[in-house]
Structure formats: structure tokens, C-alpha cells
């Protein structure tokens, strides 16, 4: 996830993002790529504890230079998509684990990234909320967003169009073998 998200650079091989080798990008360019192109959903949420859910969602928009009025509107729309617009003013300590995860997901998608990286996005969610998140990811993917989900949950992985198994940093299997259930039906 760190290499795909441009947090770390590869020590071997070449990672090409938007037609450019990432290792050739200067730090300022990498920052711009992370800010404008990639949305991150971290396993441990990474929410700012003293800020409201809405303020946490709007954080990437501050760095992108979006006006306060537009930030609020975009943040509320993102919270609405994850079913938490009624919790916009709540601090993280007032939210359940599943609600915190959905705030983190809203923050990851608020800047309309081309690439969404999600580390165990359903791990803290009940089955209903987890299903809603996966449906949201599917909707984002259908609209052109590349969604990469890192998971140990086979049922979550089976919803993917493509599955890559990685063990100790090495790709061991790749393809649709565990496959998309919709593909299996056809």
C-alpha cells in the first residue's frame, strides 16, 4: 500500500503512475500526486481527535486550496454517501468504530481521487455497514475510480474484479481465480 500510495519508493522494479515512473518524481510532485490523485483509508482511521467528523473529512480539501464554503458542501456530500451526515458535528470519541471507519472513507473520497487505497476497510464494520462500503467502492469503481482493497477477509476479496495474493511482499497468485461472484454466475 505504501508504494502504490507513493508513501514509499520501490527499491527495485519500476512503478508507473499516470504514465510516469514514480521514482523519478521529486518530493513536491509526490506530495501533489498523493493530494490530488490518491485517497487513503487507513486501517486505524487516522482521524484528528479534536476535530469533528466533517472537519476530518474536509482536511484533504484544505491542502488542495478549496474554499471553506465549498469544503463544507463537499464534506457533507461525502458524509452523506457513507450514511453519516447526521454525525457531521461529532468528534471521533463520540463515534463507534464503524462510524470512524466510514468517516475515514468519506475523507478518502472527498477530493474525488483517481485511485482509492483501502487497508481493511470493513474490518471494524458490522455486516450491513460493510456491505454498504463495498457497494460504495463498486459504485466508485464504475465511475472510473481505481479501488485497491487490502484485506485478509476472503469474502471481501471475492467482491473484487481482480485479486492479487501477496505473501511476505511477494506476489504469489494473480487473477480472478477467487473471482468476482458476478463473473462466476455468467
Outline where the language-model segments fall.
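Conserved beta-strand-loop-alpha-helix hinge in the C-terminal portion
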Residues: 170-186
Amino acid at each position: 500500500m505504501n508504494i502504490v500510495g507513493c508513501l514509499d519508493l520501490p527499491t527495485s522494479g519500476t512503478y508507473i503512475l499516470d504514465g510516469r515512473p514514480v521514482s523519478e518524481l521529486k518530493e513536491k510532485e509526490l506530495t501533489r500526486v498523493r493530494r490530488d490523485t490518491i485517497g487513503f483509508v487507513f486501517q486505524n482511521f487516522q482521524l484528528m481527535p479534536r476535530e469533528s467528523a466533517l472537519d476530518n473529512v474536509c482536511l484533504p480539501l484544505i491542502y488542495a486550496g478549496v474554499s471553506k464554503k465549498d469544503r463544507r458542501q463537499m464534506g457533507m456530500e461525502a458524509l452523506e454517501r457513507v450514511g453519516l451526515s447526521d454525525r457531521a458535528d461529532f468528534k471521533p470519541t463520540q463515534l463507534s468504530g464503524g462510524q470512524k471507519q466510514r468517516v475515514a472513507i468519506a475523507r478518502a473520497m472527498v477530493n474525488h481521487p483517481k485511485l482509492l487505497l483501502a487497508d481493511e476497510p470493513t474490518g471494524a464494520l458490522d455486516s450491513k455497514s460493510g456491505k454498504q462500503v463495498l457497494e460504495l467502492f463498486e459504485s466508485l469503481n464504475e465511475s472510473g475510480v481505481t479501488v485497491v482493497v487490502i484485506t485478509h477477509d476472503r469474502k471481501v476479496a471475492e467482491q473484487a474484479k481482480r485479486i492479487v495474493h501477496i505473501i511476505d511482499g511477494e506476489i504469489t497468485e494473480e487473477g480472478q481465480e477467487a473471482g468476482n461472484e458476478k463473473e462466476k454466475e455468467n
